[in-house]
């Protein structure tokens, strides 16, 4: 049985159970997504945006699915603690794909922000969710999006109303926990109305050594003059596979900051699509990858300048050790009429060993003549002259390499605007390079 067929058969056999444990607004697009998946299947390497990762191989194992929504017997608010110094957040949890609510976080947030289970909110406000759900994540264009849409039953809903400023960072801990190998299909819907301002920190963690396959779709609507900061940290283990698609729509004078940090994983495939639909919109998209052993990390981005006077900045850096593999493909599209566009795309990569591999493909596609756009990429090893200089001053070879690697990724970490998180990442990255870090020391499962 090929990879696609097992999921086609699964949906046909369990459609009623899937729908019964979800919400009508999510179920309304489920059959159309199934038809799209039947037609598209998994994207092959012949598809330009998937040329560096063999997707169908990732979905071959027979993972379990929690279709009947059996609750994992853990209270994350009692079992989990985040001890990042000076980081004050309003804390929420998603266990696998089930949102866990507690009473205390709401007390830390102003009126005008909703953080809730996507399925529960859709049952109470079906028209609102139907207006936004699966509108940016088009199932007829991407097989992964179609698969997630046909199987996802719950996730996270964030709604920030007009002119509401959320000073406290909203932290969402995605915990993977299961006694058996598990597939998790998670959805996140973020709606920022005009003038809204909020910051979100998503942290991925595995609480055990089971093998996980996670598909995640994030749809974010950023209204006029709104500001969204989205920080995503992956700290799982080598048996974890994560396929994540993020779709963002920005209106006039909006601002979007996206920072993705991969410190531990097995296979990670991230897709980021940002559509600049209103004049004056700005986005900053940054990524830091530290990989070793046989890790594989693939970041694929599209910045779509649809109107004039928009700005985009991209900076992705990789440090690859052992037999790890990295890939970056970034496309900047400047459409007809998108004059006065300013865009900069940079991908810099460091292969610490001869067996590490990096594939890079920055792309500019411009159909306007009054623009200022640049792109570039580099792949190399540590500078021998710099190493020699440091060795001559009594620094050991190991310490010299560590200092150079740390300085290399420091530029990306410094883009993080949350100062406590930025300081913590400086510490974590240094320990990661020293081989002393197997997981985020600030995040602890309490026995």
Where are these regions (language model features)?
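Short, low-to-moderate order helix/coil transition modules at the start of elongated helical scaffolds
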Residues: 1-217, 225-227
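Conserved beta-strand/loop scaffold segments within soluble protein domains that form the structured core
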Residues: 111, 121-395, 409, 413-447
């Amino acid at each position: 049985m090929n990879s696609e067929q097992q999921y086609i058969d699964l949906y046909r056999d369990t459609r009623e159970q899937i729908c019964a444990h979800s919400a009508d607004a999510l179920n309304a697009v489920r059959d159309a997504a199934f038809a799209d998946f039947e037609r598209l299947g998994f994207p092959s390497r012949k598809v330009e945006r998937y040329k560096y990762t063999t997707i169908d191989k990732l979905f071959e194992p027979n993972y379990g699915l929690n279709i009947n929504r059996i609750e994992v017997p853990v209270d994350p608010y009692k079992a989990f603690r985040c001890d990042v110094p000076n980081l004050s957040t309003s804390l929420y949890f998603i266990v696998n794909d089930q949102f866990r609510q507690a009473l205390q976080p709401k007390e830390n947030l102003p009126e005008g922000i909703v953080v809730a289970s996507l399925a529960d909110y859709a049952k109470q406000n079906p028209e609102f969710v139907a207006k936004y759900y699966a509108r940016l994540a088009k199932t007829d264009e991407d097989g992964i999006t179609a698969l997630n849409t046909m199987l996802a039953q719950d996730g996270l809903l964030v709604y920030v109303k007009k002119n509401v400023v959320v000073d406290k960072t909203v932290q969402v801990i995605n915990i993977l926990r299961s006694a058996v190998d598990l597939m998790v299909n998670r959805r996140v819907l973020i709606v920022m109305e005009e003038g809204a301002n909020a910051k979100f920190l998503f942290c991925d963690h595995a609480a055990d050594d089971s093998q996980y396959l996670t598909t995640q779709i994030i749809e974010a609507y950023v209204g006029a003059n709104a500001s969204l900061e989205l920080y995503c940290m992956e700290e799982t283990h080598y048996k974890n596979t994560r396929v994540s698609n993020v779709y963002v729509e920005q209106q006039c004078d909006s601002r979007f900051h996206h920072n993705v940090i991969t410190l531990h994983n097995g296979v990670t495939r991230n897709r980021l699509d940002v559509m600049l639909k209103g004049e004056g919109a700005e986005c900053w998209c940054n990524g830091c990858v530290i990989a070793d052993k046989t890790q594989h990390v693939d970041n694929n981005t599209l910045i779509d300048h649809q109107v004039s006077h928009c700005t985009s900045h991209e900076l992705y850096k990789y440090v690859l050790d052992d037999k790890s593999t990295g890939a970056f493909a970034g496309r900047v599209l400047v459409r007809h009429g998108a004059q006065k566009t300013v865009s900069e795309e940079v991908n810099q990569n460091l292969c610490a060993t001869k067996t590490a591999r990096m594939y890079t493909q920055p792309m500019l596609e411009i159909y306007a003549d009054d623009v200022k756009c640049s792109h570039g990429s580099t792949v190399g090893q540590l500078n021998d002259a710099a190493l020699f200089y440091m060795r001559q001053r009594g620094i050991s070879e190991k310490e010299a390499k560590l200092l150079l690697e740390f300085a290399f990724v420091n530029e990306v970490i410094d883009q993080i605007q949350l100062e406590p998180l930025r300081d913590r990442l400086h510490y974590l990255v240094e320990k990661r390079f020293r081989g002393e870090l197997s997981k985020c020391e600030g995040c602890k499962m309490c026995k």
